[in-house]
Amino acid sequence: NNKVQHTCQPNCMKSSTIYYGIIPLGGSKMNDYIINFLKEIMAIDSPSGYTKEVIHHCQKEAENLGFHTHQTNKGNLEIYVEGQDDYTVGFCGHVDTLGLMVRSIKSDGTLAFTNVGGPIIPSLDGEYCRIHTRSGKCYTGTILSNYPAVHVYKDAKSAPRDCENMHVRIDEVVKNKEDVQALGIQNGDYIAYDP
């Protein structure tokens, strides 16, 4: 039975049962399903403009639940849910996250970056990240201040934590710009950081 059956009562999700495809969801099973699905999509890197993988994951899940889907030319995902009458309701959401982008490769092999969206840059100091190349390779790294240690830089405590005073150190043996370029990393590559 692939018919979508809605027996939800507003503000009363505990007593509801929703049948999507052949998967009955109600009470704690619904909560577990939602939490697990959210964990799955939050584990997929998806800075604004780099959402192809997370959209594909959502599309696959919706289709597994018996829904008809369509992807627009701009990469938006539409999911069609059959209702009990001809009243149409639309919902929208987003699956992109905040992130960074390689602005330039420095002569010492570190990456200068710019923000994608509006992340609070000072909170990213010491954060692990992943650099996604256009060829599909992914490299790990760490977002760091240009002045990381008080015993070396007397202004370390007061140095601004912003895009101009921070960089990404790649977890590869790189000594210069050419080493980084040999990995396939270039300006405009997306950088996603750990949630």
What are these regions (language model features)?
Residues Q5-P195:
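N-terminal hydrophobic/helix-forming segments and targeting peptides
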